[in-house]
Amino acid sequence: MKIRFFSDAYKPKRASHRLRGEVTARALADQGYDAKILTNDWSEVDANTIVIFLKRSQPDSIQRAKDLGAKTVYDLCDNKFEEKEEYEPCCQLADLVSVNSVQMGVSTKHHTGRDSIVMPDPFERPKLESTFNPGREIKLLWFGSQSSFKFLPVVEIWQRLEKEIGNYKYTMISAKTDRLISKMSLRQAKGQVSGINFDKLDMQEWTWERQGQLLSECDIVLMPVQTDNPRTDTKSANRLIDSLMSGKFVITTALASYEEFAPYTWQEDYIAGIKWALAHPGKALERIREGQKYTEEKYSARVLSKQFIDEVIKQLGTKNA
């Protein structure tokens, strides 16, 4: 049985394609499966193939695979049914639907009537030594896609850090961060916002390598999330687990996919979390270590990919050959 991962707009830089495509395919291949990314050469797609359609796949491509006799899985990881017109027809056309979280499955069922199987995102960062030994200036880090800024109370965070913490450096890494800092600087100059110390903010352009370097250097990953948007509660825990695997204390917000990590992170008021960690460095370090252990056992690409493909084969009634 051949396993192929495909998107009509495949980009390894895109987290969903990297985690749910490249990383998962590699983990399956390492376990002896014939699994890889499908490019424009469809000559090997036949009745002995499962094609997993990732983000930005289109109905025509799913139909093409079905016409060639392949079994099809449509993978969803963004709750954008109101925006993405291809979501519903892709769900209806595919033999099976997979999602990144239980809550994403609830949304998929609501919008399409289709049941789904859950495959959480695996961690992709190498395991680093757990550390928590801040200096006088605490080094904070946020990372995420450009769209993630929509779910971040950024002005409030900047204001509260300056007012309630004082000695900090907050590095934020994403796409087009210069636009955000320019916009906010202008707003403060016009008196529309106040209390932001831009000298303590370090906005950097994202690369996979730079994110890894900054994770190794920071003290705390600070990533609160606004919960009043229906998209937030369907997200996976990929940023949280990569931060834990990088050996860092994580301060965030209680989301459905984060609940199981509550013993290893801080999911209440973020300023209180920073102060608690600074006052209890030994306890913070213990949370990181236990969180790493839990994540390594439950969220490796090897474990998740095997669980996923076993369930796919079971649901589709195919046999691995």
Residue ranges and their predicted role:
Residues 266-286:
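C-terminal "capping" alpha-helix adjacent to the active site of nucleotide-linked donor transferases
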Residues 1-57:
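N-terminal pre-catalytic "stem/leader" segment of glycosyltransferase-like enzymes
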Residues 219, 247-248:
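A short alpha->beta transition loop at the rim of the catalytic pocket in nucleotide-sugar-dependent
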Residues 126, 279-313:
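A charged, aromatic-enriched C-terminal amphipathic alpha-helix characteristic of glycosyltransferases
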